[in-house]
Amino acid sequence: MAVRNTYDHENGPHSVHGFRTGRFDFGINTTFIIYRLGETLIDAGPTNQWSTIKRVLKPLTIKTLLITHHHEDHSGNANRISKLKKLLPYAPLLGQEKLAKGYPTPLLQKIIWGSPLKVKTQTLPEQLVINQGLDCQTTVMAIPTPGHAKDLTCLFFPEQKYLFSGDMYISKSLKYLRSDENLSQLIASLRKLIELDFDILFCPHRG
């Protein structure tokens, strides 16, 4: 499957680039955007799109992979990217065991995304200094936002006022909840996020 769309937020050395891929295009929940900020990737995309993802990433310098949570569309290719780019991905502490040992996924999710591969990760700290290339560094803050998943962590770049929201925000209203989602935690996490001073939100599904 080819790249469906590309996204570019031009801001000099702090520019963000993304590409959308997916086996199906039945709505925003069946495609996925991998974002790149300099030499850092935000999430790894689904395994059944690896041929496309590999083709895009192969010529790029990638030194850091940040995983927002363990779900297969976000973490699926972390193992492959770690080998391709010789890096150790960062992941939230609460998701590391599932990423390392694997976990069952429902049939529908396997059809849409494929099955995630086990991957060794290092713990995503509360603050991390990352390279953006050309001797440019910036700080990212990990913001725990449980509700959609216990380990869901949003990534806040205070200097650029960027928020990478994982699956925290996809649409303006919820039509249904997954069986493992917690509505009260979702609301509390949203309230936490609106206290942050961000100007641009990057959603891996909506854009």
Predicted region positions:
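Active-site HxH/HxHxD metal-binding segment of metal-dependent hydrolases
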Residues: N48-Q132
